Amino acid sequence: RCHPLGLEAEGDQVLTRMLDAMNADPARRWTEADVAALGMDPSTVRRAFKRHYGMSFLELARQMRLREGTRALAEGAPVIAAQLDAGFDSASGFRDAFARLFGHPPAAMAGGAQGLVAEWLDTPLGGMIAVADAHNLHLLEFTDRKGLAAELQRLSKAAGGRIGLGRTAVT
């Protein structure tokens, strides 16, 4: 059985302390200096995250920030507000990170849409993107999958060019 947050993650004080700090401030732009200020060795933290999650703590922190921006957009916030809420100083940095994940810039997906809607889901295995309409789940994929943007672009094209952000009864 798979227990990604089971004894191994719970027993690793480095993971536990760092995740607690990251969850307490998801919009923070973490640096290795911040990790050192918490009394931890950045290389130890980096190795622990790579071993357990397959990504560095900086990559996970960036995903957490992007998740916050995505949720703000899904709630109807303007793109600039979502960018700032997510801790991105640069509009282009937020746009680029969003487009790498979704295959479209945030303005193309902001607000509700008729038909397909994408939602960011937190799971014990990591972040996932679900795309559904009112009756069917069309896509469920991990956010760190390299082919996700291309898959979302193909799905968007098949759906007439637009996928909104939000939630449906399916998700």
State where each predicted segment sits.
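Basic nucleic-acid-binding alpha-helical/helix-turn surface characteristic of O6-alkylguanine DNA
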Residues: 1-92, 100-102, 107-171
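An internal, acidic/charged active-site-proximal segment
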Residues: 96
